[in-house]
């Protein structure tokens, strides 16, 4: 079941305790909102999933809960059918009692690109902004994060996360809140803040950077991954309408422009640590995500261009430090 009370208990005696002045009212308002049309149906599925739980949890090199053969073949089929109610599964993959949830995105590939370049997460408070299904929260926990908090306003992602959490025994140090970054007060409490695949969806990228900064403690680390284009520090692509069929893409900076933005916002030790072209092996249709995917968003005769004629998706990871002077 969806439970926020356990998070309140966790943070009550932590450096996040001041969040309790505003958070319960926000989440009560979310729960009482009528905008989540499928939420009652998904909650009924979550109730049925309470029957399944395993003490086998591997978060070190994958997200694996339960093992093949731990439950009967019939129960495995029932579990798989229940999990299919949360289609489309976009971020993963997950391995649940031998069921391979082959998600649209190979989010493990992104994690493998990011992890070598960031500060160790052991004993850190971590915030993942726009966390989707919560896949990376589990990988962060697997790296020893003391507290991993994800925020994303999508009810479906919350239910996907809750399903995985329930199956693994409800880890008290991993939590998902259905909020956007703009709804958070300036907590200035997290050791590491991740924003991966969010910046280009924001109408004001500079405001987004400042919102991320407001969540970091002095000396904390920002890990930002976004779509980029080639060019100098003054190059920014603003799509006329859609980009790769997405109608909510606003600004795609060059790496040099992104570094300039981060420095302009007061970040220190700013660097690009990875650059990678997104391929149809990393983002594609699967049994668990049967809608259109990257292959349908590129020109059929030229995969280096989107269907609109823009450069095909290329992503970069930037790491920066919040200074202590502001």
From Swiss-Prot:
One of its GO terms (molecular function) is transferase activity, transferring alkyl or aryl (other than methyl) groups. The keyword Lyase does not apply. InterPro entries: CmoB, Mo5U34_MeTrfas-like, SAM-dependent_MTases_sf. Carboxy-S-adenosyl-L-methionine binds at residues 91, 105, 110, 130, 196, 200, 315. The keyword tRNA processing applies. It is an enzyme of class 2 (transferase). Its EC number is 2.5.1.-. CDD domains: AdoMet_MTases. It catalyses: carboxy-S-adenosyl-L-methionine + 5-hydroxyuridine(34) in tRNA = 5-carboxymethoxyuridine(34) in tRNA + S-adenosyl-L-homocysteine + H(+). Homotetramer. Catalyzes carboxymethyl transfer from carboxy-S-adenosyl-L-methionine (Cx-SAM) to 5-hydroxyuridine (ho5U) to form 5-carboxymethoxyuridine (cmo5U) at position 34 in tRNAs. Belongs to the class I-like SAM-binding methyltransferase superfamily. CmoB family. This is tRNA U34 carboxymethyltransferase. The gene is cmoB.
């Amino acid at each position: 079941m969806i439970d926020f009370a356990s998070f309140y208990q966790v943070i009550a005696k932590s450096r996040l305790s001041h969040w309790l002045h505003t958070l319960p009212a926000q989440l009560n308002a979310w729960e009482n909102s009528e905008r989540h049309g499928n939420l009652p149906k998904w909650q009924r599925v979550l109730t049925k999933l309470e029957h399944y739980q395993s003490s086998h949890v591997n978060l070190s090199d994958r997200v694996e809960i339960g093992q093949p053969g731990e439950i009967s073949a019939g129960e495995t089929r029932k579990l798989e059918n229940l999990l299919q109610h949360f289609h489309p599964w976009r971020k993963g993959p997950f391995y649940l009692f031998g069921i391979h949830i082959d998600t649209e995105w190979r989010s493990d590939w992104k994690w493998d690109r990011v992890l070598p370049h960031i500060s160790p997460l052991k004993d850190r408070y971590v915030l993942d902004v726009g966390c989707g299904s919560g896949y990376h929260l589990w990988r962060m926990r697997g790296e020893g994060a003391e507290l991993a908090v994800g925020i994303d306003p999508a009810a479906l992602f919350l239910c996907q996360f809750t399903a995985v959490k329930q199956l693994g025994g409800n880890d008290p140090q991993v939590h998902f809140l259905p909020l956007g970054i703009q709804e958070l007060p300036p907590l200035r409490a997290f050791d590491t803040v991740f924003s991966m695949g969010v910046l280009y969806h924001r109408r004001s990228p500079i405001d987004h950077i400042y919102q991320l900064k407001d969540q970091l403690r002095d000396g904390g680390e920002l890990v930002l991954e976004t779509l980029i284009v080639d060019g100098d520090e003054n190059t920014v692509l603003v799509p006329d309408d859609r980009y790769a069929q997405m109608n909510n893409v606003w600004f795609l900076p060059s790496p040099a422009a992104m570094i300039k933005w981060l420095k302009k916002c007061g970040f220190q030790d700013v660097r690009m640590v990875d650059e990678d072209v997104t391929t149809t092996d990393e983002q594609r249709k699967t049994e668990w995500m049967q809608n259109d995917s990257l292959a349908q968003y590129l020109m059929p005769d030229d995969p280096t261009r989107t269907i609109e004629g823009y450069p095909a998706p290329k992503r970069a990871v930037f790491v920066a430090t919040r200074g202590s002077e502001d």
